[in-house]
């Protein structure tokens, strides 16, 4: 069946301290919160929601489960470094530029930039 999937609607990230994570994702990444209730907080990221989930047993992946897209990756990297966020170096692969960073729970997340 063609057209079964239209987009990824929501990405979930488990966090150990929802209030701290809400503050970090709002202030450091500049995301706008859609709603916050019952141990969940959703942020707008383009058409996709990033939903933080309060959890007690946090397991971090060994690689980023997704990348945030930006058109100014070097400025984003600089801003994260200035905010004392643990980041990897920016890597230019030619057709895509990326770097990874960690949120307060140590989740590896990424930024990418490429010509659309």
Residue ranges with predicted function:
Residues 1-20, 49, 64-66, 115:
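N-terminal beta-strand motif that seeds the catalytic metal site of vicinal oxygen chelate
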Residues 1-4, 10, 78-116:
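Vicinal oxygen chelate
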Residues 17-18, 71-73:
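Helix N-cap motif at beta-to-alpha junctions
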Residues 17-32:
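Amphipathic alpha-helical segments
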Residues 24, 74-79:
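Short amphipathic alpha-helices within nucleic acid-binding modules
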Residues 32-64, 108-114:
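Conserved short beta-strand elements that form part of the metal-binding/catalytic scaffold
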Residues 42, 67, 98-100:
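Conserved hydrophobic/aromatic beta-strand scaffold that supports enzyme active sites
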């Amino acid at each position: 069946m063609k057209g079964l999937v239209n987009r990824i609607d929501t990405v979930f990230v488990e966090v150990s301290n929802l209030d701290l994570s809400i503050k970090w994702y709002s202030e450091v990444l500049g995301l706008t919160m859609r709603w916050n209730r019952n141990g969940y907080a959703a942020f707008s990221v383009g058409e996709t929601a990033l939903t933080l989930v309060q959890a007690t047993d946090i397991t971090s992946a060994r690689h980023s489960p997704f990348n945030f897209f930006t058109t100014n990756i070097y400025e984003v990297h600089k801003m994260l470094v200035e905010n004392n966020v643990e980041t990897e170096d920016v890597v230019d692969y030619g057709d895509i530029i990326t770097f990874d960073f960690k949120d307060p729970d140590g989740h590896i997340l990424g930024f990418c930039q490429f010509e659309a």
